[in-house]
Amino acid sequence: MKNYYLAMKRSYKSILIGILGGYLATLINLPLPWLLGALLLNLVVSFTSYKITFDKKIFLPVLLIIGVILAGSFNISLLYKIHLWIYSSIAMIICTIVGTVVVAFYFVKICKFKKYVSTLAALPGAFVVISTAISDITNNKKERGQVVIPQATRVLFVVLFLPFIFVTQIGYQEIDSFGNIATYNLRYFLEIIFLIIVSLIGTKVLEKFRIPSAPILAAMIVAGFFYTLELTTARFPDIFINVALVFLGSAIGCRLSGLAPKEILFFSFHGAIMSAILLGIAAIFAYILKIYLGFDFMAAFLSFAPGGLHEVVVISVAYDLSLIHI
């Protein structure tokens, strides 16, 4: 416990900056506000002479908690989805592969990124997982920036851009946020503790095979198994999720310190181009499903769009689009 206390003592400045950044991000309706707000403000502060750091001793437990949180989006409907909608599932896989290959090729040829960096930077989703993976794989700040900044730009670009497309095609709708409503009884806390324990065991197993980002991957696999089969229903409350995202955003923002503003602008510019390419590919695949299989174009387009899962689901609810059927 003393080690964790000392780690918090070394990291508290970054965490406080992250909380402020997350709060400011909510005021301007930034997507993934507590993550991106904490990341961006820590990044800005890192350009100054004010020294901030985030201890890895805290970072690893945060990854495990976030893995359990992400696994909470799984449910038994995932099993039915592949069985009932095989064509859209295949199209989703192909769309992801095509988008990743095209954008990775762009990053390698135009931006001169390394191949493994280009692949991570090109993936059309899972910003949290990708950001934690690159932080765990390399200590090179420039390579981290080459992945995290284009990925953050993708989330911002796509999530801010998508609602305008829906307004022009369907009309204005109010998009309300929503969260998990839990009953905080003994069973709830036992299930949460159980998920953390089995995720810790899974982490130890993956670490033996030297798999990167073991805490978050183990938690998603192990906890995801129990969530998918609905053997457990307890999920972390929204406030706990926001705290975890502040910690993650602060950790990532600190680790990008040392990048020149010119490099950040360069990575952001190409992140916007990446987003446009991925949206174009998503539109093509959605159009194919509409023409040949009769799928609703806007629903299919939204499911293929390279935005965050939470934001896409919120938009689907606002526009009464059932993503489970595509």
Regions from the PLM with identified roles:
Residues 205-289:
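Transmembrane helical segments that form the transport core of multi-pass membrane transport proteins
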Residues 11-13, 17, 74-105, 192, ...:
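Entry/N-cap segments of selected transmembrane alpha helices
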Residues 90-127, 270-318:
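Transmembrane alpha-helices that form the ion-translocation and gating core
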Residues 104-160:
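Membrane-interface helix-loop-helix junctions at boundaries between adjacent transmembrane segments
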Residues 76-84, 169-186, 230-236, 262:
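Membrane-interface helix termini and inter-helical loops of multi-pass transporters
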Residues 39-84, 222-229, 238-264:
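Hydrophobic transmembrane alpha-helices of secondary-active transporters
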Residues 325-326:
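Conserved small/polar residues in nucleotide/adenosyl-binding loops
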Residues 25-38, 60-62, 86-96, 119-122, ...:
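Structural signature of hydrophobic alpha-helical transmembrane segments
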